[in-house]
């Protein structure tokens, strides 16, 4: 610490210049669908507390890290931070994975920030530095299960910056602690809270990509796959009556809108081709009453017929 303070004091009088020897940051973290689902499920189960786990995968080359699987750690957390990693549990779990033919290595760790974004606290930076002591390319992934929605996952990957290599004064205003020298992927736009907590000085962000293989596609297709006996599950008559009543109310409203559209067409004279185009443009963004009526009536008939047929099949099979 004293050496760092002395070096900073000695560099105060130097002129600010750009440093062009920054390392490349085009490194990409590829997260599989299975690992992403397990991380989100684990993070949601711990709300409002933080949870953590380890990521398994391999370092493909100098610019690619593959995360194939994750497993949870039995760490108790608070709403701000989590405890350190349990080495005994980690060793036992890795030994059990090797017995079943899983030879992946630990490429980093993940933890959740429920509701307050993706960034690293001082405790998280210390935990990440302990992982980097074992492997210099270890990655810390932060996921926010509350702000994540369908089709958009709030997730980011980080790695710490060595404070001995960071010289603050000699850097010009245009210089950065880390420089991106590749157009592969994209970095997420940093939030204000992440910048306040040291993004760019204590740690930096990495590109994150999500990949899906053929086996993972089959797995995801089987998650909500229906079987033949699911069609025999019959809803109660009260539920069917309630749904039909709601559909009849919507049909009455659509009939009024449809009659209004018909009256407007009758009142207007026959327009030329240009006038028809303008009328079609005016209808954009409005409810197509005719199409909605066809959809609701067809679904109403299908539900009624399926309910009657299901009741007949169930009654016949029980006799």
UniProtKB/Swiss-Prot annotation:
UniProt cross-references to InterPro entries, sorted A to Z: JAMM/MPN+_dom (IPR000555), JAMM_MPN+_peptidase_M67A (IPR050242), MPN (IPR037518)
Cross-referenced PROSITE patterns: MPN
Pfam families for the chain: JAB
Biological process according to GO: proteasome-mediated ubiquitin-dependent protein catabolic process
Residue ranges occupied by any MPN domain in the UniProt entry: 29-164
JAMM motif, short sequence motif: residues: 111-124
SMART domains registered for this protein in UniProt: JAB_MPN
GO cellular component annotations of the record: nucleus; proteasome regulatory particle, lid subcomplex
The organism's place on the tree of life at top rank: Eukaryota
SUPFAM superfamilies per record: JAB1/MPN domain (SSF102712)
Residues annotated as binding Zn(2+): 111, 113, 124
GO MF annotations in UniProt: metal ion binding; metal-dependent deubiquitinase activity; proteasome binding
Membership in a protein family: Belongs to the peptidase M67A family.
Protein name: Uncharacterized protein F37A4.5
Source organism of this protein record: Caenorhabditis elegans
